[in-house]
Amino acid sequence: MSQAETTKLPYKVKDISLADYGRKEIELAENEMPGLMALRSKYGAEKPLKGARIAGCLHMTIQTAVLIETLVELGAEVTWSSCNIFSTQDHAAAAIAAAGIPVYAWKGMTEEEFDWCIEQTLDFPSGEKLNMILDDGGDLTAMVHDRFPELLDNIYGISEETTAGVHRLEVLNKSGKLRVPSINVNDSATKSKFDNLYGCRESLADGVKRATDVMLAGKVAVVCGYGDVGKGCAHSLKSYGCRVLVTEIDPINALQAAMEGFEVTTMEEACKEGRLYVTTTGNKDIILGEHMKQMPNDAILCNIGHFDTEIDIAWAEQQVADGKATVSEIKPSDIGAVDRFTFNDTGRSIIILAKGRLVNLGCATGHPSFVMSSSFTNQVLAQMELYQNRDNDKYGVQVYLLPKELDEEVARLHLEAIGVKLTKLTQEQADYIGVPVEGPYKPNHYRY
């Protein structure tokens, strides 16, 4: 696949020789991503994204490769970087580079390399700049607003994948600094109620087990936060036989957790008995040094929120620098990043996974392809919606949700693949409840 007449395009990946391996896995993933493949079939001929120059900053995985090639199939030019220093699958990046698409990503980047990679995506092989942003976590959006504001007048839209990035968009919007129409993909029902919940339900345990080979059954696990991600994590660990404790600030979420049978307590109490800790909040300072010092020997700490601010890794590293602890690298970052910190005064150790970054991507391969198809179909539709309305006033400078009918369409595209047969309303039934026969069926405020 080539996206321009020039066949040799710049890229930076770890090992281009992995391209064949990556291509085989991409072909397998396509069979598990019916939403994206349906968009290719439906829109491939008309090229609705022709002229779009999409800079993407999202985990460079096999599933993302299918997203990238869908955008190209629909007419876009694409450049890509990863939104996390540990999340790239190097064979996926190699396959995309070999396909002639500029990609700048490898597993185990430094923070400086991470910023450099994002910056490379602003320029396209034609010599032109980006005119669309597809973001996950808001780093690309922030870079353009903070460092390259001169580019903003020519950017038609931003689509944002995750909770943390949406929060950053909302902060920009409320402060009057947002300058580009934006779509919050995260809060589409077919993203947050599937990726965040069912994706984490499978990929959390995958990351923990690949990193540690630990048996989960019988252990006390602490899940910090009971939003969609926390729900998926708590139910996953419960299904493995863990006794799950939940910490939560929101009384509604706390009540939900309690009604599901989880013990809801504070970190000050939970830190004394948990053998596994999972942060899911997207906030900062969830697990502090004072908590780590009280944990049982070889307690495992990991994070599945977007940023590395939830576990106070800096405190643990400072303990080592001050001679109060030692650290042993069990696995290097290119195969999972597992570090064991031992405190001199107690002799007890804690094990930190992926250096406090996303454990499911740092220590494993992230969510399964099928659930990512749902998320990424939303992304493609958001890019199409923004780009195709670039010359009218449908979208002003604020943060929008995808229209409900598109949210429902994403779900429809995935039903046949798993054998779902949908009941159809009669006109009389539709009239009775006041909805169209073909939907949308729920108001925007419906929570699912």
UniProtKB/Swiss-Prot annotation:
Disulfide bonds: none annotated. One of its GO terms (molecular function) is adenosylhomocysteinase activity. SUPFAM superfamilies: Formate/glycerate dehydrogenase catalytic domain-like, NAD(P)-binding Rossmann-fold domains. One of its GO terms (cellular component) is cytosol. It is found in: Cytoplasm. It comes from the Bacteria. Substrate binds at T61, D136, E161, K191, D195. GO terms for biological process: L-homocysteine biosynthetic process; one-carbon metabolic process; S-adenosylmethionine cycle. Pathway: Amino-acid biosynthesis; L-homocysteine biosynthesis; L-homocysteine from S-adenosyl-L-homocysteine: step 1/1. Transmembrane segments: none annotated. Keywords: Cytoplasm, Hydrolase, NAD, One-carbon metabolism. PROSITE patterns: ADOHCYASE_1 (PS00738), ADOHCYASE_2 (PS00739). Its EC number is 3.13.2.1. It catalyses: S-adenosyl-L-homocysteine + H2O = L-homocysteine + adenosine. Binds 1 NAD(+) per subunit. It holds the Pfam family AdoHcyase. May play a key role in the regulation of the intracellular concentration of adenosylhomocysteine. Belongs to the adenosylhomocysteinase family. This is Adenosylhomocysteinase. It comes from Rhodopirellula baltica (strain DSM 10527 / NCIMB 13988 / SH1).
